Regions:
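Patatin-like phospholipase
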Residues: 1-41, 49-311
């Protein structure tokens, strides 16, 4: 539909909230917007790998729903830190305290709660591709090296290994040790992977599923306070990254926790609603770019950058 315009899609991290990406993809496809390249972080790398593998949003939805409802997925252990934001009885509150004590006890003796082998098995269930070369469209996956603090970008080689590293939540999933690196979740350094797409396409659509500070309840214990400290940094970093995108879609996910995989349908619907609300503006912007004479496109791009820097 947009011949000559290479469209990139940046899929942010956020655990179960990654299902929002599926809803957005469905709406984009329905309106003739088919990404030429995808970049994914953490949950976004999972959904990105599925989309790059099947290149069909409805197929991604079907496979994803099948897997998150399977016994194999439940065995990943997310139930240990699930955090309901709904009204709780006194018994639920007591149970939450027990869970928090459990996490603290385990973390004092180990670097993680679950082995990354479980993430590998989950990835292998979600899509058939094993190597980046098996994919139908290009995919970029980001992980984080906790030794250097750098983002590690993957475009080739083992797809499964890249996804495992990108999805290894620090302190929860076992890190990968490779080439003097300690590799964990890409969300640590690149909450929404916009920058890896900068030289790969003409127009970047970012899907932001990171919870803003206004979306979160006041922390009530040590675990939640520690988590909140990191969240502040992530929100500010993510804001910087999103400014590099040409268009941003932000699904509203009603304060649902990153481990709420039992709410997958709601996340998909949230993605659809956000995309439908934004689609007219997106289509208009794409049409304007396509109809802009090539000799002024670069000038238009820099004009937009200047507005962001000095407005």
């Amino acid at each position: 539909m947009y011949k000559g315009l290479k469209i990139g899609l940046a899929l942010g991290g956020g655990g179960a909230r990654g299902a929002c990406h599926i809803g957005v993809l469905k709406v984009l496809e329905a309106n003739g917007i088919v990404p030429d390249i995808v970049a994914g972080t953490s949950a976004g790398s999972m959904v990105g790998a599925m989309y790059a593998s099947y290149h069909n949003a409805k197929m991604v939805e079907k496979k994803y729903l099948e897997r998150v409802e399977s016994e194999n997925f439940n065995d990943l252990g997310f139930r240990y830190i699930a955090n309901s934001e709904e009204d709780e009885s006194i018994f639920s509150q007591v149970f939450k305290q027990i869970k928090n004590q459990y996490v603290l006890m385990v973390s004092s003796n180990r670097k993680s709660i679950i082995k990354n082998e479980r993430i590998k098995k989950a990835a292998e269930l979600l899509f058939d591709a094993k190597q980046f070369s098996d994919l139908k469209i290009p995919l970029i996956v980001s992980a984080t090296d906790l030794i250097s603090g750098n983002s590690i970008i993957y475009k080739s080689g083992s797809l499964i290994d890249a996804i495992v590293q990108s999805s290894s939540i620090p302190g929860f999933v076992e890190p990968t040790y490779k080439d003097n690196r300690m590799l964990v979740d890409g969300n640590v350094a690149l909450p929404t992977p916009v920058t890896p797409l900068k030289n790969e396409c003409d127009f970047i659509i970012a899907i932001n599923i990171t919870r803003g500070m206004e979306d979160q309840p006041e922390p009530s214990n040590i675990v939640e306070i520690s988590s909140r400290v990191r969240d502040v940094s992530v929100v500010h970093l993510n804001s910087y990254l999103l400014n590099e995108a040409d268009f941003v879609i932000k699904p509203k996910h009603d304060n649902l926790h990153w481990s709420a995989f039992d709410k997958t349908d709601k996340f998909i619907q949230a993605g659809e609603f956000a995309a439908e609300s934004a689609i007219n503006n997106l289509l208009e912007e794409l049409e304007n770019i396509v109809n802009t004479p090539k000799k002024t496109k670069k000038e238009t791009f820099w004009t937009r950058i200047k507005k962001r820097l000095f407005s």
